[in-house]
Amino acid sequence: MSYSGEQERQAPHMALVPMVVEQTARGERSYDIYSRLLKERIIFLTGQVEDYMANLVVAQMLFLEAENPEKDIYLYINSPGGVITAGMSIYDTMQFIKPDVSTICMGQACSMGAFLLTAGAKGKRICLPNSRVMIHQPLGGFQGQATDIEIHAKEILKVKAKMNELMAKHTGQPLEAIERDTERDRFLSASEAVEYGLVDSVFTNRG
């Protein structure tokens, strides 16, 4: 069997994914651990935010909405960030679907990861106690003719302004504060993320 480049990159990691065996009336049934957790409406967003991963996350959210549009979805985030367009496809789907999406930061939520963390349903955005959050402005690098570079520079400024507006909406911070605080990398602890409005609470245990 031949693999695409993306499948080939994913294949070694898939070999390490544990399998869960369940007894049913029809006998034994095995799932990989992520598929089993999907039955509990849990989705993982881990690693770089890129098109392949974003498509998987979007597909899972749409599937869970079709199964039950009234039950919450739980999105666990451990990400250094990634591609803006890929992240925005996840963001728009989170806002589009009917179920509330509860976001939980474990490890880190940086850049686009932080943006998606704060885009969860109000009151249902959570940090685990030793996680960290980092916000900053969009990054971009371009080559080509001067005119093309100018076009791309204008576009990234538009994207920056749009993301700042959305971040202000979700955090409750003034737009001026968001513009100032995202000018450079800004790291926040779990409790600082609550104070800033990026999340609503820090959970140390399920109790």
Swiss-Prot record:
Keywords: Cytoplasm, Hydrolase, Protease, Serine protease
GO MF terms, alphabetically ordered: ATP-dependent peptidase activity; ATPase binding; serine-type endopeptidase activity
A Pfam family per the record: CLP_protease
Known catalytic reactions: Hydrolysis of proteins to small peptides in the presence of ATP and magnesium. alpha-casein is the usual test substrate. In the absence of ATP, only oligopeptides shorter than five residues are hydrolyzed (such as succinyl-Leu-Tyr-|-NHMec, and Leu-Tyr-Leu-|-Tyr-Trp, in which cleavage of the -Tyr-|-Leu- and -Tyr-|-Trp bonds also occurs)
NCBIfam families assigned: clpP (TIGR00493), PRK00277.1 (NF001368), PRK12553.1 (NF009205)
Chain's role: Cleaves peptides in various proteins in a process that requires ATP hydrolysis. Has a chymotrypsin-like activity. Plays a major role in the degradation of misfolded proteins.
Protein name from the UniProt record: ATP-dependent Clp protease proteolytic subunit
The organism of origin for this protein: Pectobacterium atrosepticum (strain SCRI 1043 / ATCC BAA-672) (Erwinia carotovora subsp. atroseptica)
Name of the coding gene: clpP
